[in-house]
Amino acid sequence: MLSYIKRKLSESDSGVSSVATVTSSCGGDSGRAGGTGSSESGTGSSSASISGRSQNADELVRKTSQMSMDDEAIAFGEDALLHELGYKNQTELQETIYDLLRGIRDPEKPCTLEDLNVVYEDGIFVMPPTRSNVSVVRIEFNPTVPHCSLATLIGLCIRVKVERGLPHNIKLDIYIKKGAHQTEEEINKQINDKERIAAAMENPNLRDLVENCIKDEE
């Protein structure tokens, strides 16, 4: 950013120098008629203007450097979007999501998904935002066996838990770890299809299963 500011101000200074040169040239015969005094005066005025702008540039760079060194660093792009959502950086968002996932209970066993290594911190990825500037998070999970019949239910539990747990809009992509399930492609489509998700949650039996898996421990 500092180099950008210097460059823009340098361009501005070049513009001033060009104007001064053109003005001096346009003076033509009248400038010569008036002697060298007016020419020297014009040159001195131009030099003073450029010097003033140079000092302003240095001051702006100094202030910007100081702001960057403060605790509240200047944020750009994806980091700025995360700041708007209340996170210092990607790591804080990843940790927040993992705290939601770690307590989800397995549909069959008396364990959490964290206990079984179905979910893990390295499986949470903050992706570039959408064109409409919505944050995107990808969650990867690893079923305990390649033929796990409850993989779709687990994916649904992950989605519902995170969407309810975060107080802001986010695009959530959930995928089975590559090669971890025999029908991973079909399951990935199901757990990322809004219509299928809505239909599944309208089923009272399936909804009860999800609620039991994601409810907080008392």
From Swiss-Prot:
Effect of gene knockout: Mutant flies show temperature-sensitive lethality. Prior to cellularization many embryos display signs of incomplete chromosome segregation during mitotic divisions likely due to defective organization of spindle microtubules.
SUPFAM superfamilies for the chain: Fe-S cluster assembly (FSCA) domain-like
Compartments, as annotated in UniProt: Apical cell membrane; Cytoplasm, Cytoskeleton, Spindle
Composition skew (Gly residues), residue ranges: 28-37
Gene field: galla-1
Gene source species: Drosophila melanogaster (Fruit fly)
Residue numbers bearing the Phosphoserine modification: 14, 65
Remarks, miscellaneous: The name 'galla' means splitting in Korean and is derived from its role in chromosome segregation.
A Pfam family reported for this protein in Swiss-Prot or TrEMBL: FeS_assembly_P
Protein name per UniProt: MIP18 family protein galla-1
This protein's UniProt keywords: Cell cycle, Cell division, Cell membrane, Chromosome partition, Cytoplasm, Cytoskeleton, Membrane, Mitosis, Phosphoprotein
GO CC term (a single one): spindle microtubule
